[in-house]
Amino acid sequence: MASDGTDVVALYGGANGLSHKSGSFSVKVGLAQMLRGGVIMDVVTPEQARIAEEAGACAVMALERVPADIRAQGGVARMSDPGLIRDIKRSVTIPVMAKARIGHLVEAQILEAIGVDYVDESEVLTLADDAHHINKNNFRVPFVCGCRDLGEALRRIREGAAMIRTKGEAGTGNVVEAVRHVRSVMGDIRALRSMDDDEVFSYAKRIAAPYDLVMQTKQLGRLPVVQFAAGGVATPADAALMMQLGCDGVFVGSGIFKSGDPALRARAIVQAVTHYSDPKILAEVSSGLGEAMVGINLSDPKIHVERFAARSD
C-alpha cells in the first residue's frame, strides 16, 4: 500500500445508507487519503502538539493520557476533555484527531461538534458498548477504526470508517501485534485475489464481511480505504517496517513522548516513514536518539498485559 504517491485509493461507492446529515462517504475517504505517507502522533498538551507539528507530523491525536499511561493507571478511559482538545486545536495548523469509546455515539457527536478533523473509535479506551460500533455513516466527520484481519476491516468500512489502522497493542512499545495484524490483512487480500467469484461469495460469508466490499478489495488488490499502522511503534525502524509491509502511514503514541528525546525521535520517525525503503537514511536517522521507551514484552508469561486489541471485533 505504501507507494511513491502517484497512485490513489479507489473510493468505495456502495450504498451506505447515508442520511441527509452525513457527509458524502467518498469525501470522507478523500480526507483520510490526504494523510497518506504521514505520521500521526499522540499528544496530551498543546506543547507536545507543537513539537509534533514541527517534527513533520501530518496530524495529531489529542489525548488526556497516552496509551502507556492508560495501561499503567487503569480505571475507565473515556473521551478527552473537550477543553483540552480545543486548546490543542488552537496550538497547531495540522489536523487534530480525538478518540471516542467504541459504541459511544454521544462522545462522537461531541467531538464532531467541537470541530475535530477525524474521530478514532478506539479500543484503547474502555468499551461503551460491547455489542455495537457507532454508525459512522450518520456523521460528517471521517472516522478511523482498528482491525486485526480483513473481515474486521471490511465490517468497519461498511459502518462508515474512512480509515483503517491495525490495532496492535498500544502503550507497549512492542510492534509484534501490529505486524501480526497487517500481515493478516495483507495475507487475506493475497488469498482473495486468487479466488473465483463463487469462492469470493463463500469467503465473504466466512469472514462475515459485505460481499460487495470483499469483491472490491479483490479487484483493487488492497483495502478500499487507507490503512495505517498503529500499536507499539516506538522506533524509526518500527515505522519503516510497517511501511515496507504495505501500510499507508503510521500512528505513534507512547513511543515518542515516553522516550529520552521526544523532539528528535519524532523527527526521526517522520523521516523513516518518508524514506522507509532506504537503509542508509534509516541508519542515519536512527542514530543518537537517546533511550527509547522501555516497552513491554508481550510474550513474557510472568507479565499480565490486557489485550486492548481483543476488546471488540
From Swiss-Prot:
UniProt GO BP? amino acid metabolic process; pyridoxal phosphate biosynthetic process; pyridoxine biosynthetic process
Q: Which InterPro entries has this protein been placed in?
A: Aldolase_TIM, PdxS/SNZ, PdxS/SNZ_N, RibuloseP-bd_barrel
Which Gene3D superfamilies does the UniProt entry name for this protein? Aldolase class I (3.20.20.70)
Q: Which residues make up the binding site for D-glyceraldehyde 3-phosphate? A: 183
Q: Which reaction does it catalyse?
A: aldehydo-D-ribose 5-phosphate + D-glyceraldehyde 3-phosphate + L-glutamine = pyridoxal 5'-phosphate + L-glutamate + phosphate + 3 H2O + H(+)
User: Record keywords: Lyase included?
Assistant: yes
PROSITE patterns cross-referenced by the UniProt entry:
PDXS_SNZ_1, PDXS_SNZ_2
Q: Where is the active site?
A: 99
- A single MF term (Gene Ontology): amine-lyase activity
Give a single Pfam family match.
SOR_SNZ
| Stretches of the chain forming a coiled coil according to its record | none
Q: What SUPFAM superfamilies does UniProt report for this protein, alphabetically?
A: Ribulose-phoshate binding barrel
Q: Which CDD domains match?
A: pdxS
Q: Record-annotated residues binding D-ribose 5-phosphate?
A: 42, 171, 232, 253-254
Give TM segment ranges: none
Q: Which UniProt keywords apply?
A: Lyase, Pyridoxal phosphate, Schiff base
| EC number, UniProt record | 4.3.3.6
UniProt pathway annotation = Cofactor biosynthesis; pyridoxal 5'-phosphate biosynthesis
Stated family: Belongs to the PdxS/SNZ family.
Further comment found in the protein's record: Vitamin B6 is an essential quencher of singlet oxygen in plants, that can protect cellular membranes from lipid peroxidation.
- Protein purpose: Catalyzes the formation of pyridoxal 5'-phosphate from ribose 5-phosphate (RBP), glyceraldehyde 3-phosphate (G3P) and ammonia. The ammonia is provided by PDX2. Can also use ribulose 5-phosphate and dihydroxyacetone phosphate as substrates, resulting from enzyme-catalyzed isomerization of RBP and G3P, respectively. Also plays an indirect role in resistance to singlet oxygen-generating photosensitizers.
Q: Which PANTHER family does the entry mention?
A: PYRIDOXAL 5'-PHOSPHATE SYNTHASE SUBUNIT SNZ1-RELATED
Please give the name of this protein: Probable pyridoxal 5'-phosphate synthase subunit PDX1.2
Organism whose genome encodes this protein: Oryza sativa subsp. japonica (Rice)
Q: Which gene encodes it?
A: PDX12
